[in-house]
């Protein structure tokens, strides 16, 4: 590999230009060049000395056999370095080598001619040779020329032969150095570099004399300030130049010996040059000599040769006198500190040289000198000390071995950074673009080595800013020469890149983008929401700079990538104007590339383009399809420790999948977001599916700025199985088609997170073009986000029903409350599959009212029964036959549906369920045809009041019932009341907005106490928590149950209906909403046992008896009972209002209580009891009968009215 030009020991390397001569393939030339670079270090002990000692022994290699001559093989020539060759010899090309491929057909005369041309172009080259590689033996005699050398073949020891060839070249080079030494010695005047050239502008004077302290030394040498030489005559300048030439000649001798590997001789000459230059005030050459002296010290340290510092140099650094003059091993720490002190002096000398206009240091030389020393510090920092590892890398550019712990002094990063940044200045603006880019590149490389990635990228931005206008100007000049527009040149340049790999600038672009938070190699992005200090503006400026660079190179693909990257990372913080300008550039670049025949696309910038995906079913609104799975047999449940496990249920719910039908189209609603302030054109979008094959529709639309757009896409499965909708394949204008997933909303914020740490060891990765190209092909982001997919099960073709006819037009149907009617529908099987099972189901809004009513916490048991009765026994819709039927393809069937208009059933739904399955199938699918029905319900006739009275004819078995009806309608209505037991009907005409009464006799209901004590039934099979009102009604006693059961008997016996005069409308009158009072309940019912009693005297009924005369109390019991009953007699004297006993008032012959025996055949029992009165007065006699066994739970029966008995002596 080529040596680093900014290495600290770069002045000790001989520049050798290697060129291909004749017909040489690129790959062969690279391999031959690699062979030369393998043996670039030539030991002086291996160089033959006969030729070198012919004239002089000054460059005899055996004088210092430990020395090495190092070649730096170049493949290009920099003509701008020629003006500095006399100042720094390491810039001069001393060796010219032409590589010839012996396996190709070559012409020797042409090779020699080419070599002569290059010798004339490089007149200072001391050696010019052609090396023929891989030459067959039979062709060796062809290349018989003095300047042509036969190189190694594949069957030879390649390294040995190459080293032998270079040793011969080195011997000839040393002979040339001897001649050059004599010519230098013969010179009378040696001038400093000409700084009048624009690219060799002198260093500008700085006000600060900052220097870096060495470790352990607080003293710094003080240099005497010399006034600037502003004006001198020609003669005086000439005399001064002559006086300065002695020191400069010694400096050039030292440079030659340094290049020749004779380091001790170079140290001697540099020491002399320092002394002479110091005496004459030649600051430029004194600084150069002192700088090269430090290079010699580093080389000697690598050779482990002790060095004795000359006294004139030690006098400049008194603190190092004892440490550096002692004999023994060289101390690395002391040497590094000493070099640091010398480097400070060199820097001051170069600064002082700016006061001498004719001898000022060129800005290029100063920056390179600074960077060479900074490179030394960087290597020491990387090797954790100035040790053998660091020296091997500095001298031979060997790989740096890992070191766990620092054993010597390691300069800190801040110190190294200060030295690197001192190479920057205004003088760089006057350098040529090549030298300027080389300076900025070296600074960026060193800053990256110490971990200052932000400053490294800053230098890369300076490099881009310097390179872009030069490239644009070059394009303009080429277009001006050819007389065409510069855009045509750009188009031709871009077209020439179509078939080649043109991503060479991507590593540079990628690194800059990474450092400014636009892209990271690990896939993370910088979240700009947490960087509020103008970060987005900085990113915008950086991208503009990179886009300008790509534009100057006609790299349209990189322009599109950069703009897409800007939209990806800065969309949340970029201003509207920035977004609009970027999108205009994106559109212009894409259209220009397309017109030029270059088809390139950038990755789309928004990975979360889809915000939601919803299933909306069939695209035909008239036929809403609902598919569900019916399980014929219950699935077995695994035994577990829990009675109910909610997690299992949640898992089952999550595993539920929608069901699709083969060859039936379904639609999805997809919501796309556009976070930009510009309109984005979606050229194509369709659903992305996995699993079974399906046909997907395509769509195109435009997303408005800062909006969420909704579009509908359809999919038609073509076979049975599982179908997964994973997202959408979207093609945006100028972008690659990308699969957009649907992500969980809670995980989207994880895709962007703050990444402000410094990058570590990314340079090696960035050098790989494959890595960079893959990185820019798809924008990376967090891959651990959860995606959502719509999973479906595709089943075989299913029957499809449609409504062919209905007897009423669409709209609301007008009905009165509880009016009955009939709806006629004709359904047709429009599919090619037979519907083997078709059933009719109904839904209406009264169910919601029922659920709301039963949710009342104060609802009682009887009210709950009324609601359940209306919900379950009085459905809104009924069908004549509830048995399933079948329809063949194309067949029609007429369905008659009866309707009962309940008050809360304004909205209804008729469902025709169709399916195809065999009787033995346990699982099948059904499809519902939904027909909505809207009812407009109004009041017609309702019961305003009801009452029951005792029969006026005195028959206790009958009562009178009064029903008061009110007509809400605008026409007269006929109301009919019918009794079920007698089948009698009573009708009355009720005028509009008026009421009328119907009065009729009704036989009273006989109810036993057991029937009354029955619990109020619950018609619902569902289990629910009893409300407080329901519990209270259950615990309530006899009254509520008696009222409930009597009402039930009454509603079974009495029905009321209404009809119009034309008999077109009719309906029933709902009577359950009215409450039955206790009085009405008693009048409507009679108990199963009745008591009649009277007083008998001489077999006649009397009400008055005489005292002390016996009379009879006759008790007559009617009814039946399954068990024995017990009666009780009691009386009360009215004048005293106190109960009496058998000892005062009245006397009973026996006990007051006795048993009455009933059986099925004995329904009438008469009992006579003898009594007499011995006290006059008025008495009320009471009789009560009750159950003998269950007295506490039985309801006693009393005499209807107490017997009034008058005892009077008269």
Curated annotation (Swiss-Prot):
Protein name: Transport protein particle subunit trs120
Gene Ontology, cellular component aspect: cell division site; cis-Golgi network; cleavage furrow; growing cell tip; trans-Golgi network; TRAPPII protein complex
Main location: Golgi
Family according to the record: Belongs to the TRS120 family.
Highest taxon of source: Eukaryota
Entry's localization field: Golgi apparatus, cis-Golgi network
Keyword field: Golgi apparatus, Transport
InterPro entries listed in its UniProt record: TRAPP_II_complex_Trs120
Residue spans of biased composition, Low complexity class: 214-233
The organism's taxonomic lineage, starting at the top: Eukaryota, Fungi, Dikarya, Ascomycota, Taphrinomycotina
């Amino acid at each position: 590999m080529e040596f680093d030009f900014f290495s600290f020991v770069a002045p000790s390397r001989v520049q050798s230009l290697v060129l291909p001569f004749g017909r040489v393939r690129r790959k062969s030339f690279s391999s031959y060049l690699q062979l030369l670079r393998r043996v670039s270090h030539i030991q002086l002990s291996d160089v033959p000395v006969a030729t070198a000692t012919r004239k002089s022994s000054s460059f005899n290699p055996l004088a210092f056999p430990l020395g090495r001559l190092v070649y730096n093989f170049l493949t290009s020539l920099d003509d701008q370095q020629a003006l500095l060759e006399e100042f720094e010899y390491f810039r001069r090309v001393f060796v010219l080598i032409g590589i010839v491929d012996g396996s190709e057909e070559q012409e020797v005369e042409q090779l020699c001619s080419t070599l002569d041309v290059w010798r004339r172009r490089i007149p200072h080259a001391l050696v010019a040779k052609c090396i023929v590689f891989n030459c067959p033996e039979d062709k060796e005699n062809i290349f018989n020329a003095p300047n042509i050398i036969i190189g190694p073949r594949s069957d030879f020891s390649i390294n040995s032969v190459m080293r032998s060839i270079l040793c011969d070249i080195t011997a000839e080079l040393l002979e040339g150095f001897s001649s050059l030494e004599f010519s230098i010695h013969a010179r009378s005047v040696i001038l400093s570099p000409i700084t009048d050239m624009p690219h060799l502008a002198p260093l500008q004077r700085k006000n600060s004399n900052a220097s870096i302290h060495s470790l352990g030394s607080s003293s710094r040498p003080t240099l005497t300030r010399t006034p600037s030489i502003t004006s001198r005559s020609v003669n005086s300048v000439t005399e001064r130049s002559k006086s300065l030439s002695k020191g400069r000649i010694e400096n050039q001798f030292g440079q030659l010996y340094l290049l020749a590997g004779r380091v001790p001789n170079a140290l001697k000459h540099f020491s002399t040059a320092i002394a002479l230059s110091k005496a004459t005030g030649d600051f430029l050459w004194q600084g150069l000599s002192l700088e090269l002296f430090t290079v010699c010290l580093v080389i000697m340290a690598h050779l482990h040769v002790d060095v004795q510092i000359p006294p004139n140099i030690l006098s400049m650094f008194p603190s190092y006198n004892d440490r550096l003059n002692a004999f023994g091993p060289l101390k690395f720490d002391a040497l590094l500190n000493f070099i640091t002190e010398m480097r400070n002096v060199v820097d001051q000398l170069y600064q002082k040289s700016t006061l001498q206009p004719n001898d000022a240091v060129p800005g290029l030389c100063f920056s390179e000198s600074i960077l060479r020393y900074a490179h030394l510090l960087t290597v020491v920092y990387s090797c954790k000390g100035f040790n053998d590892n660091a020296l091997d890398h500095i001298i031979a550019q060997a790989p740096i071995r890992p070191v766990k712990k620092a054993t010597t002094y390691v300069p800190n990063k801040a110190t190294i950074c200060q030295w690197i940044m001192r190479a920057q200045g205004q003088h760089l603006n006057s350098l040529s673009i090549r030298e300027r880019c080389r300076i900025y590149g070296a600074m960026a490389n060193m800053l990256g080595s110490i971990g200052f990635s932000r400053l490294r990228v800053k230098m890369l931005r300076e490099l881009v800013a310097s390179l872009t206008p030069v490239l644009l100007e070059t394009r303009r000049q080429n277009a001006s020469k050819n007389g065409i527009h510069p855009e045509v040149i750009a188009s031709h340049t871009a077209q020439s890149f179509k078939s080649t790999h043109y991503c060479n600038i991507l590593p540079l672009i990628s690194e800059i983008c990474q450092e400014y938070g636009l892209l990271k190699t690990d896939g993370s992005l910088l979240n700009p929401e947490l960087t509020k200090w103008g970060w987005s503006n900085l990113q915008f400026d950086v991208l503009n700079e990179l886009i300008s660079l790509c534009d100057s190179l006609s790299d349209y693909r990189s322009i599109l990538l950069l703009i897409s990257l800007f939209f990806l990372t800065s969309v949340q913080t970029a201003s509207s104007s920035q977004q609009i300008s970027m999108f205009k550039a994106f559109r212009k670049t894409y259209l220009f590339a397309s017109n030029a025949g270059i088809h390139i696309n950038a990755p789309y910038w928004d990975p979360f383009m889809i915000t939601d995906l919803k299933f909306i079913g069939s695209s035909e609104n008239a036929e809403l399809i609902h598919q569900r799975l019916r399980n014929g047999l219950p699935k077995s449940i695994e035994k577990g420790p829990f009675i109910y496990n909610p997690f299992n249920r949640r898992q089952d719910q999550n595993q539920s999948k929608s069901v699709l039908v083969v060859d039936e189209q379904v639609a999805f609603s997809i919501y796309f977001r556009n976070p930009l302030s510009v309109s984005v054109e979606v050229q194509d979008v369709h659903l992305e599916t996995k699993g079974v094959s399906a046909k997907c529709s395509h769509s195109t639309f435009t997303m408005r700025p800062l909006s969420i757009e909704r579009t509908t896409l359809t999919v038609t499965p073509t076979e049975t199985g599982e179908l997964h909708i994973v997202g959408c394949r979207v093609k945006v204008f100028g972008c690659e088609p990308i699969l957009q997933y649907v992500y969980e909303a809670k995980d989207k914020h994880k895709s962007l997170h703050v990444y402000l740490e410094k990058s570590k060891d990314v340079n090696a990765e960035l050098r790989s073009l494959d890595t960079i190209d893959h990185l820019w092909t798809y924008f990376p982001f967090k891959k651990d986000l959860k995606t959502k997919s719509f999973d479906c099960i595709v089943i075989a073709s299913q029957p499809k029903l449609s409504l062919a006819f209905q007897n009423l037009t669409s709209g609301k149907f007008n009905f009165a409350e509880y009016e009955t009617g009939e709806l006629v529908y004709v359904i047709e099987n429009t599919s090619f599959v037979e519907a083997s099972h078709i059933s009719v189901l109904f839904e209406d809004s009264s169910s919601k009212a029922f659920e709301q009513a039963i949710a009342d916490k104060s609802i009682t048991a009887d009210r709950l029964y009324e609601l359940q009765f209306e919900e379950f026994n009085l459905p809104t819709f009924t069908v004549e036959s509830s048995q399933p039927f079948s329809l063949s393809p194309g067949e029609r069937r007429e369905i008659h549906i009866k309707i009962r208009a309940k008050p809360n059933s304004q909205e209804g739904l008729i469902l025709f369920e169709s399916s195809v399955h065999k009787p033995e199938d346990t699982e099948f699918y059904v499809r519902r045809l939904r027909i909505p029905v809207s009812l407009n319900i109004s009041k017609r006739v309702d019961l305003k009041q009801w009452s029951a009275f005792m029969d006026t004819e005195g028959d206790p078995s009958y009562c009178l019932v009064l029903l008061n009806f009110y007509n809400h309608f605008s026409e007269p209505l006929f109301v009919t009341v019918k009794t079920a037991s007698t089948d009698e009907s009573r009708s009355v005409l009720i005028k509009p907005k008026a009421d009328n009464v119907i009065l009729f006799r009704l036989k009273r209901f006989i109810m036993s106490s057991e029937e009354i004590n029955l619990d109020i039934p619950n018609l619902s099979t569902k289990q629910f928590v009893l409300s407080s009102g329901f519990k209270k009604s259950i615990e309530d006693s006899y009254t509520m149950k008696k009222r409930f059961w009597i009402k039930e008997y009454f509603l079974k016996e009495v029905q009321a209906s209404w009809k119009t005069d034309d008999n077109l409308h009719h309906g029933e009158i709902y009577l359950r909403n009215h409450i039955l009072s206790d009085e009405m309940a008693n009048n409507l019912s009679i108990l199963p046992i009745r008591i009649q009693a009277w007083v008998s005297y001489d077999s006649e009924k009397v009400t008055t008896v005489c005292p002390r005369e016996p009379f009879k109390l006759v008790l007559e019991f009617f009814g039946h009972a399954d068990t024995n009953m017990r009666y009780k007699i009691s009386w009360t004297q009215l004048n005293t209002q106190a109960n009496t006993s058998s000892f005062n008032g009245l006397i009973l012959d026996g006990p007051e209580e006795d048993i009455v025996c009933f059986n099925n055949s004995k329904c009438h029992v008469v009992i006579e009891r003898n009594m007499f009165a011995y006290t006059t007065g008025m008495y009320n006699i009471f009789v009560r009968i009750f159950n003998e066994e269950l007295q506490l739970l039985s309801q006693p029966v009393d005499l209807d009215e107490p017997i009034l008995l008058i005892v009077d002596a008269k």
